[in-house]
Amino acid sequence: MDIIVVDFSGVYDFESFASGREIVHVDCRGLNGVDCYCDADGRNALRKTLAPYPAKALHFIDSGDYHYLTEYWVSRLQEPFSLIVFDHHPDMQRPQWEGVVSCGGWVTDVLENNPYVKNIIIVGASDKLIHEVPTHLREKVMFYSQAEIDHHQAWPSKAGKLIHEPVYISIDKDVLRKQDAVTDWTNGDMTLLQLQAVLRIIYAHEEVIGVDITGECSATLDYLSEVRSASVNNKANEELMQMILSETTD
């Protein structure tokens, strides 16, 4: 599986997992109109920049401010698929401006506009935030609670009955507890080991055609804090990358 690092902030300069020779780096640091909200010009620039790279790959896409890139990657899939999202936030807000895709609303964009998506499953979202999603949208998405995550039969008995097509997985590390990921957004309470266990269950039951991982921590004025954050996230990224590659080659 190809590994593609999409760099908006330079954060991967502090993470050694990204230094492997087999990893392709895409420098997006000079793009405008892409931070958290992506306007039409930013969207066009991103599409042009990312066009040479495959959607069926493992993508690292910087901080959660750029999670909307998942919408772009899955728009490139020309076959029926199910989308599985690990995120402490449902990312189903309505856009504030017409024609703008956002880090907080991209799931709704996929749900309403992608002709190939058959199911959307969100794992680890806050119950409070789930209930804030408009009912007509919430009813079209399957949510997995923390209790269900801990029960290994939950996937085949619930989601497994729905899915009859390949899956694309999107992981925002803010679904993890603070000890396992330092992000720009509020964290959930899933451990890295729990996340890996659920991913293995998915790989055992489904055909995974692409993955992206977001949730890096943006730069601050505190250099030591940046280094500490990068160290925690580097460990998570390294472990997830190695696990995904091992599942892909098995």
For each predicted feature, which ranges?
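Hydrophobic alpha-helical segments and helix pairs
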Residues: G64-N119
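Catalytic cores of soluble, metal-dependent hydrolases
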Residues: D2-I61, D65-S82, I121-L129, T135-D250
